[in-house]
């Protein structure tokens, strides 16, 4: 596969969506993408037609029909399997770039550390759902829990975002562990939006600039 797969990860309110929109405009004009390559923007859950339906079930279930933790985990795995097979892998095989708001790291952080489900089980499901696909580069937008809570209070929340501070603290710990273990690129997300955008641009130039590409 000659395309590039980029992922933004982080706790609620870290600014992933804002930075995704910025990169959607910046990357195609950056000179980093090969001629003819397109940029596919996507998210998890919800990157495919099936994923949109699964996203609604997971985040906004009807009435009191919230899925149990294990069922929730399996719904995320189903979304990812469809996402990889239907969108991500085909795009990469055609030489395009894919930029995703969340990927498998979020499942480990939220369902593993947050829900305290078995990490080994989650990693086994990750291998099945992704068929071994690993992002070329993952950015961790690191945000203090206190700031996340402040930002969350200023907007409407889905079922996961409405969880309490203890849950969010465990999730933040999970992201920190994953960033270290998986060599993610950490970026301080409690800066001005423009500063975070500039840091993202610098890192992308560092990893995918002409010199780096010639060494691959």
From Swiss-Prot:
Q: Which reaction does it catalyse?
A: dTMP + ATP = dTDP + ADP
One GO MF annotation is: dTMP kinase activity
Q: In this record, what's one Pfam family? A: Thymidylate_kin
Signal peptide boundaries: none
This protein's superkingdom? Answer: Bacteria
- What are the entry keywords? ATP-binding, Kinase, Nucleotide biosynthesis, Nucleotide-binding, Transferase
Q: Which Gene3D superfamilies match?
A: P-loop containing nucleotide triphosphate hydrolases
Please name the GO terms of the biological process aspect recorded for this protein, alphabetically: dTDP biosynthetic process; dTTP biosynthetic process; dUDP biosynthetic process
What GO cellular-component annotations does this UniProt entry give?
cytosol
Which of this chain's residues are annotated to bind ATP? 10-17
**InterPro entries assigned:** P-loop_NTPase, Thymidylate_kin-like_dom, Thymidylate_kin_CS, Thymidylate_kinase
* The EC number(s) this enzyme carries: 2.7.4.9
Q: Which family does it belong to?
A: Belongs to the thymidylate kinase family.
Record's function text: Phosphorylation of dTMP to form dTDP in both de novo and salvage pathways of dTTP synthesis.
Give the protein name, as stated in the record.
Thymidylate kinase
**What species was this sequence derived from?**
Prochlorococcus marinus (strain MIT 9313)
